[in-house]
């Protein structure tokens, strides 16, 4: 909102406008977030339209990271703009004034299509049946390995991805490679029995074994290859695929690396489905420049397409983009900095569900999977996350 | 489809595969189109899924220009892959074999959401009422001036654009500039009574007069400014808007110019809604590079969002992209080459609806509006379009 020109009629209005303008600036400053005032405005608008609303839902609808939303919400509570009730965040009378008189909000309806949840496509019976099968298999997944930025998409998400590939003509008769597949998108894809060939490269043997068991049981064919993507693809995977699908680590170098391996698989041209986190503009801009420099065009970008299980603090919702490539060229950055934990080391605190003891994960113990409590407990819940400052 | 490796069991299959592969190559070569084999595959897939289907619908679903689709369809008819019935294009038995045995198509359902037609948003009652008003006003539009690439979006399209702006938080309390508005998107936007300020710059006085009449009659405020966008914006429009909306000429220079004028209006940061034609990859890539170089990020891109009236040959459906800008900088190319007619001069043939005489438009007579038949007829129908080769 650009504040320009005449400031209304009376003195009262001038004061209120100035007061709210200063308040907005202060909140943005205190929250210290890349998107500044716009993010604060977005959060207030979403609460105004959907209150009472949970912090997680605010994050989904604003496409802002959950910790940012939580921080802004706390500051807004202190400023008496918001109050927290059992059912979620609500605007106070002051907050309502702020929303209506200053931000000029008045209408509360959401126009997002309820049939498709804004994705633009829906599952028919055939894909619904596939989803039901995927749900069963997804329960057998191992625990996430956060050191390699694992974070599992919901079975619904992976099935919608397969449906989107079908709808756009990128599934029937096509050779498809999954560049990393902790999301198990190869499962619904294989269950369609539409692809000419499906292959998965992943560094995590646990994921590959699950996919192999699945293939055996369901009578489908998925080639699995254990491979560290920091190294070039094996020769027999090169230049033989029509389509690749990836949900890489959410760093610029992670994106460049995974897409480059995808390009090795595609050769000079092909289609890439990229799932990626909503990012602050500066980072977003480097990412889009990297994408176009590799020779990919963004032919479609659907926000809030992907939802994830478990670690909702890290990734609650991301977009999917369909990239069309011609004269593709690989572009690999610093392969040592691809995981977010390496860029910004993170300590996670887990609570033992048996005795309640708090454990640190991220220094000596690297993965929650390696954690065993002194009481013998093996189930934990993440309660806090902390970024370590880089030296 | 990459054709690799083993070619099946028997001799018959080898021959068929080879035959169809040669056929696909030949059709793509004869059609001489930028997207090559993929475009031909896309056309066959859309016919397979939706037959019988009109050429216009094929163009919409494949996002290919109508003349290209018509050309490929004619070649496919000659090759006995397609037949034309009263109800549209259908595959022959040979075509079905081609689709099922070679392209490996088998499933025919469309997963595009029928509620929102793939747009991801729907109009509620409030916006439906607005649409009904816009429909009435749209009937009063002048004839399109094709020398400045006019082509009117449907009232539904312009109302959906306003709805999208609302849904994304870019309407309430915002200052919005329409950089060119032959689509009359300012009308539904103003009817919401949500914006802080609405302004329109356009070179066509007829459009501005209609908007002025509308504002007077409907009691809304839209500032209209007659302006040739090849010149910088008037000083009092600079750096005062939060959001711009544009559907520029579909040339790289047209896009750069219109977005740059938008940046003058926004200042360092802001939101842009860009409607633009689905283009062949090479051109698309220059366009996306131009967008990111100006400092805009594509935060969302919805294909087939916009539909146009009348000149369906030129533009049947285009996408809308929501761009978010930070540290924006203008980037103006060759302002003399912004209109497609100047890049590739086009002759249009119009038939008088009274006497049937055919008239040429594009050389001496520049606009269909200037055309009067010797019989006195003033209503014409475009029947053919021809590109002149540039010297």
Curated annotation (Swiss-Prot), chains A, B:
Gene Ontology biological-process entries: polyamine biosynthetic process
Pfam families: BpsA_C
Residues forming coiled coils: none
Top-rank taxon: Archaea
Gene Ontology MF: a single term: transferase activity
Gene3D superfamilies: Vaccinia Virus protein VP39, Winged helix-like DNA-binding domain superfamily/Winged helix DNA-binding domain
InterPro entries assigned to the protein according to its UniProt record, in alphabetical order: BpsA, BpsA_C, rRNA_MeTrfase/Polyamine_Synth, SAM-dependent_MTases_sf, WH-like_DNA-bd_sf, WH_DNA-bd_sf
Record-given protein name: Uncharacterized protein MJ0675
């Amino acid at each position: 909102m650009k504040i320009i020109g005449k400031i209304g009629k009376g003195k009262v209005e001038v004061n209120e406008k100035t007061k709210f303008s200063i308040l907005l600036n202060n909140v943005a400053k205190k929250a210290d977030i890349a998107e500044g005032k716009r993010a604060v405005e977005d959060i207030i608008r979403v609460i105004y339209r959907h209150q009472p609303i949970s912090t997680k839902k605010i994050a989904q609808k604003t496409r802002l990271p959950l910790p940012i939303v939580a921080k802004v919400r706390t500051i807004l509570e202190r400023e008496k703009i918001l109050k927290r009730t059992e059912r979620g965040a609500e605007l106070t009378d002051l907050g309502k004034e702020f929303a209506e008189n200053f931000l000029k909000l008045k209408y509360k309806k959401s126009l997002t299509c309820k049939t498709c949840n804004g994705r633009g496509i829906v599952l028919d019976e055939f894909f619904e049946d596939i989803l039901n099968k995927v749900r069963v298999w997804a329960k057998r997944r191992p625990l996430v390995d956060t050191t390699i930025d694992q974070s599992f998409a919901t079975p619904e998400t992976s099935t919608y991805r397969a449906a989107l590939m079908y709808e756009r003509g990128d599934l029937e008769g096509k050779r498809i490679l999954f560049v990393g597949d902790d999301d198990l998108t190869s499962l619904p894809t294989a269950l369609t029995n539409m692809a000419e060939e499906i292959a998965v490269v992943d560094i995590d043997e646990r994921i590959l074994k699950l996919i192999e068991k699945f293939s055996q049981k369901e009578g489908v064919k998925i080639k699995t290859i254990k491979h560290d993507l920091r190294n070039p693809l094996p020769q027999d995977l090169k230049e033989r695929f029509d389509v690749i699908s990836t949900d890489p680590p959410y760093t610029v170098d992670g994106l460049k690396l995974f897409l480059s391996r995808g390009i090795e698989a595609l050769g000079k041209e092909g289609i890439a489905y990229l799932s990626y986190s909503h990012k602050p503009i500066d980072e977003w801009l480097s990412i889009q420049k990297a994408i176009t420099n590799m020779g990919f065009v963004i032919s479609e970008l659907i926000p809030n397409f992907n939802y994830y299980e478990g670690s909702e603090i890290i990734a609650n919702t991301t977009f999917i983009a369909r990239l069309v490539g011609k004269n593709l060229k690989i572009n690999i950055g610093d392969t040592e900095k691809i995981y977010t934990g390496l860029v910004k080391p993170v300590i996670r605190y887990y609570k033992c569900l048996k005795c309640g003891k708090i454990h640190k994960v991220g220094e000596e113990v690297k993965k929650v999977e390696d954690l065993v409590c002194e009481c013998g407990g093996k189930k934990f819940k993440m309660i806090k996350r902390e970024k370590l400052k880089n030296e």
